Amino acid sequence: MSEKGRLVLVDGSGYIFRAFHALPPMTRRDGTPVNAVYGFTAMLMKLIDDLQPDHVAVVFDVARKTFRSDIYPEYKANRSEPPEDLVPQFALVRAATKALSLPLLEAPGFEADDLIATYARLGEDAGLATLIVSSDKDLMQLVRGDITMLDPMKQRRIGAIEVEEKFGVTPDKVVDVQALAGDSTDNVPGVPGIGIKTAAELINIYGDLDSLLERAGEIKQPKRRENLIEFAEQARISRQLVLLREDAPKPLDIDAMKTPARDMDVLKAFLVEQNFKRLLIRIGASVDAGTSASAAVVRSMGVTLPATAGQD
């Protein structure tokens, strides 16, 4: 039996923030900040070279407001605006994706996570082994069978065992645990007084969120019982917020996501424009001048740079 083809889905939106905070400030000749673009581009180059996937796509958020905001207006309302130096880099990471000849996915009204869920299902239906490249715990609900994750910051593979270690339940029950525990980062309310550990214990006992809420009167701890009854609808709303949609729009079909050969002329032009000397050396191109970056920090992001590259 032949080995399954591999689909790699890269959480582009998640990675740009991590690259921005992991690398020191960098600017190109016109003063535009590019540290996140550098880390993002270096990671993608290494990732594709290492994995050699049959199919690939880089997935982005379009805007903060999605269908979840209609369900619960306070969803993610506590998040601050992105740093000023990061704003111009959002367009540049998309340009980097295209310069690397990689398919790009985004859909208004949906989060990148929903597109990843949708395409993971499509890959599964097509008989592909899907690898989700992300550090986002919210994507762990998708792990099953031939769908696994890679945390690019820690270079750590995540399967069902790792998900259960983090949440205390199997991947198919992660959504119910998150619905109970809530998430302060995304302003998902959950049920007061219930964290991940308690939520996992309850779901493991009662099987799922609906069964737990139906039998909340059986809970012995008075305050916990009271909260589960009083905030039952809040838990159901939270489940709608954390559950990833597998019916998001599909900008491309799977066949259009076959890993293409790089257009080296396009890539070189992009790297020259950004002053990414080290990456130009990596692809064997001549360089004139560039910007500087910390090789040690870049390596800590899981990106190994040539020892002879000098400064960017």
Language-model segments: residues:
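Long, highly charged low-complexity segments
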Residues: 257-312
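Conserved nucleotide-binding/hydrolysis micro-motifs of P-loop NTPases
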Residues: 14-15, 63-66, 137-139, 154, ...
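Conserved DEDDh/DEDDy metal-dependent 3′-5′ exonuclease domain
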Residues: 55-57, 109-111, 135, 311-312
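Basic, polar low-complexity surface loops/patches
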Residues: 16, 36-37, 47-51, 89-100, ...
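Short, basic, glycine/proline-bearing loop/turn elements
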Residues: 22-33, 97-107, 299, 305-312
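Non-catalytic, usually N-terminal nucleic-acid engagement modules in DNA/RNA processing proteins
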Residues: 1-57, 61-71, 79
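Extended two-metal-dependent nuclease catalytic cores across DNA- and RNA-processing enzymes
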Residues: 2-3, 26-27, 77-251
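C-terminal structured "cap/appendage" subdomains that terminate the fold
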Residues: 230, 253, 257-260
